[in-house]
Design a protein with these regions (language model features):
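Positively charged
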Residues: 1-157
Length: 157
């Protein structure tokens, strides 16, 4: 496993729509392992392939049980409720803004071997599912905020 360089806001790759994964091979497994290692080293909650320079529909997300889920070709199939809270991004370091997302999200995705499964999450996990899947369509959370939060506002939240 290796830690990959995280692409920062302003890089054009973060605005591109990712292509589906069709080959479930050793290269994919290596990328998934590297993405998980990168997520752990960055102390993040989620990471999408374009954030490490790869235009494929792949994300890794920390779930409600503190396990890292690998989501390949993911799609949101159900949402419920609403939550508004501070959100940040490894590609926009040190900046946070208030974003409204569903309180509960269920996704359908493939695992590293191509098998379809469903995963669900509340609160932070639901937020991460939405945030990371948005990356796969070339969107950043900054499109949903009025302004960045000050350090004081973030500490008081």
């Amino acid at each position: 496993m290796a830690t990959r360089k995280i692409v920062l806001q302003g890089d054009e790759i973060l605005t591109k729509v990712c292509r589906p994964v069709t080959n479930f091979d050793e290269r994919l497994h290596e990328l998934l392992d590297d993405m998980k290692e990168t997520l752990i080293q960055a102390n993040g909650a989620g990471l999408a392939a374009p954030q490490v320079g790869i235009l494929r529909r792949i994300t890794v997300v920390l779930n409600d049980d503190d396990e890292i889920l690998e989501l390949i070709n993911p799609e949101i199939i159900y949402t419920e409720g609403e939550q508004t809270g501070p959100e940040g991004c490894l590609s926009v370091p040190g900046k946070f803004g208030m974003v409204t997302r569903p309180e509960f999200v269920r996704v359908r995705a493939q695992d590293r071997n191509g098998n379809w499964f469903e995963a669900e999450g509340y609160d932070l996990t639901a937020r991460c599912f939405c945030h990371e899947l948005a990356h796969l369509d070339g969107h950043l959370y900054t499109e949903h905020i009025d302004r960045f939060l000050s350090d004081e506002e973030l500490m008081n939240y």
